[in-house]
Amino acid sequence: MDTSKDLICIGFEGTAEKTGVGIITSKGEVLFNKTIIYTPPVQGIHPREAADHHAETFVKLLKEALTVVPIEKIDLVSFSLGPGLGPSLRVTATTARALSLSINKPIIGVNHCISHVEIGKLKTDAVDPLTLYVSGGNTQVLAYTGKKYRVIGETLDIAIGNCLDQFARHCNMPHPGGVYVEKYAKDGNKFMKLPYTVKGMDISLSGLLTAAMKKYDSKERIEDVCYSLQETSFSMLTEITERALAHTNKAEVMLVGGVAANNRLKEMLDVMCSEQNVDFYVPEREFCGDNGAMIAWLGILQYLNGKRMDLADTKPISNYRSDMVEVNWIHEENNNSENGNIKSRIIPEHLIGKGAEADISKGRYLEFESITKERVKKGYRTSELDELIRMRRTVKEARFLAAIKELGIYAPSIFDIDKENKKIAMSYIHGKIAKEKIEEGSIDFCEDLGKIIGKMHVGGIVHNDLTTSNFIVSDNTFVIDFGLGKYSDLVEDKAIDLIVLKKSIMSIHYDKFDRVWNKIVEGYKTYNLAESVLECMKEVEKRARYL
């Protein structure tokens, strides 16, 4: 095929209950894009019924598409290889193979999740965004680094779309339920406290879902329950996006996926991005949910940059994670640069640091060098939830910074706590954060990080936000930022603590990951229960369902 001419690709999307066919050119012009959603006769989606829906509707959509673009003009066939429901993926792959063989054109299977990101970039001005991808089956925070889209944060159990749909079914709302939850939430005026579970850059939604169902069953107004569910879950999503933003220092945030159509979620992220001085993007509604155009576009990107597939390579992959894809179409020299410099988040000059939760300023407390950590109000959260979170985390951090010293772990000294304004004044530590040391090539000290984590776990303390930004290395190694910390002797909680750290290292220290992680594990093994925690880590990682 002559790749110098404008290619036309047809894309088939069928990972769950939506059947999509799209046609796009290599210049990014969408010639056809239509999706038909399967609405189950009873609650819930049966995989076989969804697959039958694809078998019927692909034929209809293909016929319609070929009235817009004649079949002889198709140069490439693309389809969603995964992740998704097995029966749906098989029907989609079979449809694509049949067309490819009948017109003798090449075929490309693509990752569904990354397709959302790339169509979002095509349809907005985003170049190198931190992406929040939210849908019925997926909840991920993604960032491109080191030839891959890294999963920096994700749900530890159910996806946000699934959470909203399950709640809607429980309340006898039609499918898809998220639309009706949003509608009811607009008329809610009473915020009810529900579980708010953030672990580093990951979230858990199952407890929130159960609690919301119980509120509904207890005869609370459905408008108020929907309002509280939406405010709580979307605040969690916005927070982990903000945490990932502080960790990666990206200059852009993009929202994609079916749940991206929710106006309240878009509003929250827009406010957060304004507070963090970064750009926010969301594609038009047509390209938020599952669609064939996004599949066709990623197929073109991969094909033009050398990707080729034989029919034997087109077997669907139901657990096809975003970080399994080798990205061949992004070239570093063109990736979000201004005059050759990579764009990054801008921190205000009066601060020495700006995290996801707090502004950090340097000063003096009596005769001592100090920093003040202020948990600032978050404009995206309701005032009730914001006050609760900031107060709880301010007090918790002060308590844990004192507690870990009793375990022989170095931490800043607390000078003063201003609970009313959510401020902590503490000693200034001369040193570099571990993130900077690793970027400079220093690795050996990472064994100390493992030992520190082991000591915390011996003392029953789980940090819940372990990243290389939360250790300061000087003559000794200090651990900071305990706002998400808790006491727990559960092996799984300790395993998740390590998983949070492991994912944060992979996201920005990918080229040094093995050396850094091995050093940390070596140090952690000084903890007498280390082996059981490390084994549990493997089990928890295997459970990652929403890919």
UniProtKB/Swiss-Prot annotation:
Its EC number is 2.3.1.234, 2.7.11.1. Residues 346-547 form the Protein kinase domain. InterPro entries: ATPase_NBD, Bud32, Gcp-like_dom, KAE1/TsaD, Kae1_archaea_euk, Kinase-like_dom_sf, RIO_dom, tRNA_threonyl_synthase/kinase. CDD domains: ASKHA_NBD_Kae1_arch_bac. It comes from the Archaea. It is an enzyme of class 2 (transferase). The active site is at D465. One of its GO terms (molecular function) is protein serine kinase activity. It is found in: Cytoplasm. Its cofactor is Fe(2+). L-threonylcarbamoyladenylate binds at Y133, V134, S135, G136, G137, D165, G178, E182, N262. This is Probable bifunctional tRNA threonylcarbamoyladenosine biosynthesis protein. It comes from Methanococcus maripaludis (strain C7 / ATCC BAA-1331). The lineage of its organism: Archaea, Methanobacteriati, Methanobacteriota, Methanomada group, Methanococci.
